[in-house]
Amino acid sequence: GCPVPSNPQRIVGGSATTIDRWPQMAALLYTFNWNAYWHYCGGTILNNRSILTAAHCPANDPPTRWRIRVGSTMSNSGGVVHNIANIINHANYNSATQDNDISILHTATPIEFTNNVVAAAIAGTNYNLGDNQVVWATGWGATFQSGWNVEQLREVQIWTINQQICIERYATLRAVTDNMLCSGWLDVGGRDQCQGDSGGPLYHNNVVVGVCSWGRGCAQAYYPGVNVRVSRYTAWIQSNA
């Protein structure tokens, strides 16, 4: 799952990777003290001024609390850092239910594309994503608590999970809506997104189909990770990016 960062875990069961494999990735950097900015969430580059993430990352913060780093394998060094000019959370984002947990950050300066900085392909409205499809999650998954260390990008291969099964697994905890997409290694566990991976992408054939949103714990066999289902928001993304 992708809860709000609380302890310094990262992509579970995955392996280290490099930004040239996932050049659409952005690290979202947060400041507590208005001095140092540390990795706190993930994001995806949409175009030369927009980053897709989860609304629960910026929540109600002013844009000055956040910066983004692009083009670097390391979350807290390298690449290019951009200030954020404004934050557009989905108007129907509900922090209690985590429904519509999607947000776009606009950078103060244009993002320059390179081999390591590329705009993502996002799922269209009619994108057909079946059950048990191979998907990849990527992220740095470190919080400020371990932010003193250089953190390398990680990747993990997981699978899409049947919506009805996911609804039933979470029935006593929270509603899984049509706006959500479940992923993981069902009844095996050990692979998932985790704290600090929030807002980062879920890829299917290099198309972004999910945004890491929430879950019960991380990499549990019984509880899948839950993502924003990007295909439900294609029009919203295009009109706000």
What are these regions, as identified by a protein language model?
Residues V4, M74, H82-A85, I102, ...:
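Chymotrypsin/trypsin-fold serine protease catalytic domain
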Residues T31-W34, H56-D61, G71-N76, A108-F113, ...:
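Acidic glycine-/aspartate-rich tracts in secreted/extracellular proteins
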